[in-house]
Amino acid sequence: MRATEARGLLSFIDASPSPYHACATAADMLGRAGFGMVEAGETWPEGGSQFLVRGGTLIAWAVPPEVEPGVGFRLVGAHTDSPNLRVRPNPEREQQGYRQLAIDVYGGALVNSWLDRDLGLSGRVALRPADGTTEPEVRLLRIDRSLLRVAQLAPHLDRQVRTEGLRLNPQTQVVPILGLAGQDQRGFRELLADELKVSAADILSWDLMLHDLQPGAFAGQAEEFLSTTRLDNLGSSYAVTRAMVRSAEGSTARPRISVICLFDHEEVGSTSANGAAGGLLPNVLERISLGLGWGRGDFLRAMSSSTLISADMAHAVNPNYQEYYEPGHLLHLNAGPAIKINAAQRYATDAIGEALFASVCAAASVPVQRYLGRADVPCGSTIGPLLAARLGVSTVDVGFSQLAMHSARELCGAADVGHMVNALTAFLTL
């Protein structure tokens, strides 16, 4: 099972170069498991297993038969976005005979890791509607050929790089090369039009980003690692979706409503219509309860007894940088998911949540670790505190560990994928 889940994660990530593709991949997994897709503006079926996609965000739920009014939700959240390089609205540049694309750095990307890589292009494109309305047609785009490259400066021309390290100005030094100028090549908009088989005049706007073309792979002497991209946080998104599929296939110890949420925009603060700080999830939860004929009091009772797991990747100890970690709470690859704890509530875990997840892992025969950062280093955060405050539900932050977080190429333990899937499945079913 562990090897199966590891291979499944590699396939999931390779199929998901952007948040929009990640939602499409997760939607396909759910659809094959019998979940039906609904639209926000339509009336939803009562009960059953459904999912909603809005941009780079997906929410899915499974309502068992004869669920009691006011029974709590079991929620698991993750995010679909990863730090990367994104294409600007007017991106075309010409310098010294080269055609280039201007980019923005999205999130806290380790920009140096994007240098000298074969880069493709992916995301979504908004097209002029064919029916004459104002609602654009949106299509996914994926170009999986070596289209772009950010070339590093040779050390012969920058002698200080060896002693002072690499420093990059993203405005001037992280501008991908698209081709040579002056060769009657079609413009960027025409390139997109050719890929989509539309007129360039019909392209209105885009949300496009660069992606590394190297596929994911098993790594290490015993193939105990996974080397891939976007582990933060497609590693968790895959585990969350697989847990939902597996829980829907089996029986639960007692009827409860299971909900998973894969949010966009976590890497830039979550304060968007599709982010965890927005109103999408509370609205979906209330609509589920209304569809079951619950009153407002039933819904509020359900929220008061609900529990949320925020699943986001964690920091495994890097043997080359041991001094950056809290020595009493080191995480190791293939040693199971970690419960994340922070006294300043940068993680939402409290003692009750910690005990709950530890009990779930024990029931599923999954090893568990604890993670805390150093007291003298500021702690990152997740969607956990945002959702805990927004929903008022008990929340625990967890995640399986990795190396090189926010790099264009990351590393995790192959066995940890199965550990995480098993733990989350147990949470949704026990």
PLM regions with names:
Residues 1-430:
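N-terminal hydrophobic/helix-forming segments and targeting peptides
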